[in-house]
Amino acid sequence: MAKAKFERTKPHCNIGTIGHVDHGKTTLTAAITKTLHERLGTGEAVAFENIDKAPEERERGITISTAHVEYETEKRHYAHVDCPGHADYVKNMITGAAQMDAGILVVAATDGVMAQTREHILLARQVGVPYIVVFMNKCDMVDDPELLELVDMEIRELLNEYGFPGDDTPIIQGSALKALEDPNSEWGDKILELMHTIDEYVPDPERDTDKPFLMPVEDVFSITGRGTVATGRVERGVLHVNEEVEIVGIHEDIRKVVVTGIEMFRKLLDEAQPGDNIGALLRGVQRDEIQRGQVLCKPGSITPHHKFTAQVYVLTKDEGGRHTPFFNNYRPQFYFRTTDVTGVCELPAGTEMCMPGDNVEMTVELIHNVAMEQGLRFAIREGGRTVGSGAVATIIE
């Protein structure tokens, strides 16, 4: 059967359900697809069973089960991720396997805020999920409006505590199960209200081409009489010939240079776009003044740092990780973009050691600078073997 062509007519947004186990994340995901399909005639309804038995994927050596569904509102096309298990969420968010432009936090009105509700909000904050919209589920099982109000307050306080705008965050009350049973009921209206709220509250994500230019340097060579060429894959933004860029990373100082030519597959280009594997000819740069591990970027868009806090997932033995815990002052390699940098891990006060399978916040000090920003992903390696995965949470220096 021929595959349908993906029509890019609407803005695209990546979204996902987060929240405590059994609060109804997967039921809500199914209810959204069914309600939008029946009420707006968009997309396809995906059954609960098909979301729940998500296939295992391997992302950077880590086994993650994730279900991907898509749906559309009148305004946008959404790609939605839902994970069956709590550990899958932790891995997913930290590895950036599924980058989210926004999260739908599902909280059961019958339980209120639970342990994983808290952990998922913390993770969302640490890895840089910019927006959260709340769906208070199972409201059909709560008769007391005062109880709903208490849960509402509890959620807002928690969001504030982790640096989200709790007072202004939309909270939609509904029942995913009732909406799934009858999308045309008032419970179905609540699903439409949720999606309309997400359309309005979450701004259109910035496209990769609109972001400031960045290309990690993979290789460097010199062409006699022409200068030095840095090669790599454009991560974001657009580069034009004769534009000025900065060389950032490894050293304290930042060097400005002009790109006098761009090549791809031995052909000359006027501009390079995200995903292009290019060679950038740099004016007046010596072969030894730029190296793998640095980046070329739009001037002023990213700065070099060596000390930061990070949210880290430690691989289990089965995932090919360590068989034993590690302790404070552990010194592995941190793999950023194209290169390994040695660093020292400082565990949180009161944490003696870190076991395989743990998710931990740590402070890291690298032996030299890396072009860094919040949300940047990295791998932790020992002798070329990946033993952990992380995201930069805050930059210290």
From Swiss-Prot:
Record: residues binding Mg(2+): T26
EC annotation from Swiss-Prot or TrEMBL: 3.6.5.3
Keyword annotations: Cytoplasm, Elongation factor, GTP-binding, Hydrolase, Magnesium, Metal-binding, Nucleotide-binding, Protein biosynthesis
Annotated region described as G5, given as residue ranges: 175-177
UniProt region (G3), positions on chain: 82-85
Principal subcellular localization: cytoplasm
Subcellular localization(s) per the UniProt record: Cytoplasm
G1: region residues: 19-26
Region (G2), start-end ranges: 61-65
GO cellular component: cytosol
EC category: hydrolase
UniProt keyword annotation of DNA-binding present: no
Catalytic activity: GTP + H2O = GDP + phosphate + H(+)
Entry GO MF terms: GTP binding; GTPase activity; translation elongation factor activity
SUPFAM superfamilies the record matches: EF-Tu/eEF-1alpha/eIF2-gamma C-terminal domain, P-loop containing nucleoside triphosphate hydrolases, Translation proteins
Region (G4): 137-140
Domain tr-type G: 10-206
Binding site for GTP: 19-26, 82-86, 137-140
Domain of life: Bacteria
Record keyword Hydrolase present: yes
Record's function text: GTP hydrolase that promotes the GTP-dependent binding of aminoacyl-tRNA to the A-site of ribosomes during protein biosynthesis.
Family: Belongs to the TRAFAC class translation factor GTPase superfamily. Classic translation factor GTPase family. EF-Tu/EF-1A subfamily.
Complex and partners: Monomer.
Protein name per its UniProtKB record: Elongation factor Tu
Gene: tuf
